[in-house]
From Swiss-Prot:
Region (NADH dehydrogenase I subunit D): 208-593
Organism for this UniProt entry: Pseudomonas paraeruginosa (strain DSM 24068 / PA7)
Subunit architecture: NDH-1 is composed of 13 different subunits. Subunits NuoB, CD, E, F, and G constitute the peripheral sector of the complex.
Keywords: Cell inner membrane, Cell membrane, Membrane, Multifunctional enzyme, NAD, Quinone, Translocase, Transport, Ubiquinone
Bilayer topology: Peripheral membrane protein
Keyword flag Cell division: no
NCBIfam families per UniProt: NuoC_fam, NuoD, PRK06075.1, PRK11742.1
E.C. designation(s): 7.1.1.-
Protein name, entry field: NADH-quinone oxidoreductase subunit C/D
Region ranges (NADH dehydrogenase I subunit C): 1-184
Length: 593
């Protein structure tokens, strides 16, 4: 598959069983244990000894599962609702995507605490590398044959595996922290880069290589992010991205918050995405609860999500152009973002982190005058985008710094788990809002911007096109906003509609319990992915019939995008790396969670 090939994306079919039939035909139905879930995909448990065989088959089957979308683990030891599932102390899941089928499948493996070993999948999908490192970091599960199984998010000297159920979840459960001079020296020494550990040479045939730290506090790194560069002059021979400096333990926090009280934490994953972060989470919880929201809720959610897509892309545009040397545009983009925030603040009450979506609806209805504010923004913004394209994106210096730089094709993008504008810039027409509509996107008319060179310039141009399409979607929301309630009439809607609590004691009791303790979700698993600001973002939730999540897996696009860096930039110049980093569109909170 090349950047120029036309990849046909068939209509989405949830719970597509075709691959199950093919697997049963190849391996026998007795090989698999089928797990019923609300994830919208087949979930199959396989014996460990057949794992690589099954994964290889899925990678090579006609219309193959070319993308390892996600790979992570679960500590099963305290889970009570496991009827019909293989005995397991821990489990590892492999979430695979086939664009040619437009379907997913999840493969799970059960592990005993006495033998936490699996064969690596890095020979099948190169992007399994970081995911397996994170699983080892969080759970202590070893992947035999992995090229470099070391800490991913935690410091090199860290003791223990934080996502285990017996690992403390609150700071008060730890001993008081102290940092002696000796311990500080130990931590600093552990961070020292040793080229030999990564198979790098210090000397070539006729040259000595220099090793340069870009970050973790370099302005072009866009956050606390370190890339160690092996250089021959200014040419990048090899590099090692190092993440984890911004890790906050978001998935661990989800196990100690109620389904309702975790919503504000989602805002802080991609902290530029605002309510866009809430959407996959509440949609996944609503699948668990069996809640169908009113049409008005769908349209409100889409409108606000597209506002935050524009807000994100404006910041991206300004900082990207600034990274390659033009200082003025970032001030203009921030001025335009202020106009958008004026609308967001009027509707939600907050700006950067509204935490405004709710289980079963939104926090409150649209205020009086919202339509006038939205109309003013829609009248203003198109002219500004025209100016950006004319004044900045057609600039010869920008084009010279970015056209043909950090280029990759569709095949490479899929192998590394690249989604969003980074994938569509290669010519691959895959946007979840079209390919797998959610939250009512199937009712809107818009185009999917594409490019074909897959370089730093094309990624920016795709983002520009997306802003225009977001304006088009918001326009339709403005003109066709349905009447009706802003919350679903369902027992698990949280909080329940406030109006009834003043007259109905049972509703008042439910309101009190759901806000204080949290709603009790049925034991099951649910999954929702969305086309977020930076690519595909998803929440995979496991409920054990409690007021809190048993396991919350947050898959972010930026994690996959940064893992791809060495395969794209090796052999280029340092200046090209700066342009490449600016074109990716990432924030480290989205990477490290």
């Amino acid at each position: 598959m090349t950047a120029d090939s036309a990849l046909y994306i068939p209509p989405y079919k949830a719970d597509d069983q075709d691959i199950v039939v093919e697997l049963n035909s190849r391996f026998g139905a007795e090989t698999f244990t089928v797990q019923p879930t609300r994830t919208g995909m087949p979930v199959l448990w396989v014996p460990r000894e057949r794992l690589i065989e099954v994964l290889t088959f899925l990678r090579q089957v006609p219309k193959p599962y070319v993308m390892l979308y996600d790979l992570h683990g679960v500590d099963e030891r305290l889970r009570t609702h496991r009827r019909g599932l293989p005995n397991a102390d821990f489990s590892v899941f492999y979430h695979l995507m086939s664009l040619e089928r437009n379907s997913d499948v999840m493969i799970k493996v059960a592990l005993s605490e006495r033998d936490l070993n699996l064969p690596t999948a890095t020979r099948i999908w190169p992007n399994a590398n970081w995911y397996e490192r994170e699983v080892w970091d969080m759970y202590g599960i070893t992947f035999t044959g992995h090229p470099h199984l070391t800490r991913m998010l935690m410091p090199p000297t860290w003791q223990g595996h934080p996502l285990r159920k017996d690992y403390p979840a609150r700071a008060t459960e730890f001993d008081p922290y102290s940092l002696s001079a000796a311990k500080q020296d130990l931590e600093q020494e552990a961070l020292r880069f040793k080229p030999e550990d990564w198979g790098m040479k210090r000397h070539g045939e006729n040259e000595d290589y220099m090793f340069l730290n870009l970050g973790p506090n370099h302005p072009s790194a866009h956050g606390a992010f370190r890339i160690i560069l092996q250089l021959d002059g200014e040419e990048i021979i090899d590099c090692v991205p190092e993440i984890g400096y911004h890790h906050r333990g978001a998935e661990k926090m989800a196990e100690r918050q109620s389904w309702h009280s975790f919503i504000p934490y989602t805002d802080r994953i991609d902290y530029l995405g605002g309510v866009m972060n809430n959407l996959p989470y509440v949609l996944s919880v609503e699948k668990l609860a069996g809640i169908k929201v009113p049409q008005r809720v769908d349209v409100i959610r889409i409108m606000m999500a597209e506002f935050f897509r524009i807000l994100n892309h404006l910041l991206y545009l300004g900082t990207y152009i600034q990274d390659v040397g033009a200082m003025t545009p970032v001030f203009f983009t921030f001025t335009d973002r202020q106009r958008a925030y004026k609308v967001v603040e009027a509707i939600t009450g907050f700006r950067l982190h509204p935490a405004w979506y709710r289980i079963g609806g939104v926090a409150h209805d649209l205020p009086r005058g919202w339509d006038k504010l939205v109309r003013e923004f829609l009248d203003w913004m198109p002219k500004r985008l025209d100016e950006y394209e004319t004044a900045a994106l057609k600039n010869s210096i920008l084009r010279g710094r970015t056209i043909g730089v950090a280029q990759y094709n569709t095949k490479e993008a899929l192998e590394w788990g690249t989604t969003g504008a980074g994938l569509r810039a290669t010519g691959c027409d895959f946007d979840l809002r079209k390919a797998r509509p959610y939250s009512g996107y199937e009712n809107f008319e818009f185009e999917v911007p594409l490019a074909h060179n897959g370089d730093a310039y094309d990624r920016c141009m795709v983002k520009m096109g997306e802003m225009r399409q977001s304006l088009r979607i918001i326009e339709q929301c403005l003109k066709n906003m349905p009447e009706g309630p802003y919350k679903a009439d369902h027992p698990l809607t949280t909080p329940p509609p406030k109006e009834r609590t003043l007259q109905h004691i049972e509703t008042l009791i439910t309101h009190f319990l759901q806000v204080s303790w949290g709603p009790v979700m049925p034991a099951n698993e649910a999954f929702q992915m969305i086309e977020a600001t930076k690519g595909i973002n998803s929440y995979y939730l496991t409920s054990d019939g409690s007021t809190m999540s048993y396991r919350t897996r947050i898959r972010t696009p930026s994690f996959a995008h940064l893992q791809q860096i060495p395969s794209v930039i090796n052999g280029s110049m340092i200046a090209d790396l700066i342009a490449y980093l600016g074109s990716i569109d990432f924030v480290m909170a989205d990477v490290d969670r």
